[in-house]
């Protein structure tokens, strides 16, 4: 797979990073590309960058690249850089392919500015991929029945490299909920409706109100949306 789109999006996002910044760090392959580029910049320019990672993946990648790890108790992120699995024409996103959507959303909401970086192949007219929902294991059966009443096909995400379900960094299950095409005027409402089900921790819908900008990368360049 050609990764130049991810590289170009990450490279443009790097221009937003200034010495002394506290970064909210999302998760996923594009964020890892960003962190590798950031590591080069830290080494070359002697920058001090602080980071609040949203997953073990980004935690280890940040440490490896010279980012000093801090937390939300003492720090408010100046800028959150994260990826997405789909971005619609209004900049609504679906995230959670890696199961880190709960901490990603917390870090994003705590940040002063949120920038999503994606390969342009993630851009769609309307959201349509299954929505990841983090669920307490105790409530799994109940949540599955309730969420299917909302008109979706729901399935427990199975692990790869292990037997049984995917377990999030928070110790919970992930249920992937296929609502088909999600119309733009339903996105924010659907995000809230899912969260009202007892036992749901969070879901992977990131409505446009949370997003300040999206950077989309192609094989030749990147642009702000």
From Swiss-Prot:
Pathway the protein contributes to: Carbohydrate degradation; pentose phosphate pathway; D-ribose 5-phosphate from D-ribulose 5-phosphate (non-oxidative stage): step 1/1
Give the superkingdom in one word.
Archaea
Q: Which InterPro entries match?
A: NagB/RpiA_transferase-like, Ribose5P_isomerase_typA_subgr, Ribose5P_isomerase_type_A
Query: What processes in GO biological process is this protein linked to?
Result: D-ribose metabolic process; pentose-phosphate shunt, non-oxidative branch
Q: Which residues form the active site?
A: 104
Enzyme Commission number(s): 5.3.1.6
One of the record's GO molecular function terms: ribose-5-phosphate isomerase activity
Residues annotated as signal peptide? none
For this record, the Gene Ontology CC terms, alphabetical, are: cytosol
Q: Which UniProt keywords apply?
A: Isomerase
Q: What class of enzyme is it?
A: isomerase
Binding site residues for substrate:
27-30, 82-85, 95-98, 122
User: Per the record, what are the reactions this protein catalyses?
Assistant: aldehydo-D-ribose 5-phosphate = D-ribulose 5-phosphate
Family, per the entry? Belongs to the ribose 5-phosphate isomerase family.
User: What job does the chain carry out?
Assistant: Catalyzes the reversible conversion of ribose-5-phosphate to ribulose 5-phosphate.
Q: Which NCBIfam families match?
A: PRK00702.1, rpiA
Tell me the subunit arrangement. Homodimer.
Give the protein name, as stated in the record. Ribose-5-phosphate isomerase A
Taxonomic classification:
Archaea, Methanobacteriati, Methanobacteriota, Archaeoglobi, Archaeoglobales
User: Which gene is annotated as encoding this protein in its UniProt record?
Assistant: rpiA
